[in-house]
């Protein structure tokens, strides 16, 4: 029972870190990155489909992304989705592929993005701590119901605290890495 609760907690915390990693990867740095388009979705024959499934995305230069749709009919729809997104880039369409020049970020914009990264990191830490709180409540219930001994439950609480601390540190490292990427000129 206790092991199950701890295992579930670790699994959920890992998922929270994974979501944080994905959220942070969506924050645009000054460099071109194919991942910046992973959340863009277009209407493809009636169903919402990510651009990454409709085109190959390559980065031939540090500040240039080339998108080549598998289906040439979708060229305009992909271009429109990129233009209407919050990425702050302007795609150019040459009839067969889309070139996206990634402009250099201003110092002010870098600072905004660092704040955004810290906010996403804080959200992830809050979700990890909420997972910890729920498992602690479960452990207290187990102790109260007499399903496990006092020593077992307190050992499990210490393990849970250690696990929580490890995942919070992982999130801090992700945010610090992203901050370094953003502030690098």
Swiss-Prot record:
Pfam families: RRF
Disulfide bonds: none
GO biological process: translational termination
Subcellular location: Cytoplasm
Chief localization: cytoplasm
UniProt KW keywords: Cytoplasm, Protein biosynthesis
Protein's UniProt keywords contain Metal-binding: no
Database matches in InterPro entries: Ribosome_recyc_fac, Ribosome_recyc_fac_dom, RRF_sf
Taxonomy, superkingdom: Bacteria
GO molecular function, one term: ribosomal large subunit binding
Gene Ontology, cellular component aspect: cytoplasm
Function in brief: Responsible for the release of ribosomes from messenger RNA at the termination of protein biosynthesis. May increase the efficiency of translation by recycling ribosomes from one round of translation to another.
Family note: Belongs to the RRF family.
Name of the protein this chain belongs to: Ribosome-recycling factor
Organism expressing this protein natively: Mycobacterium leprae (strain TN)
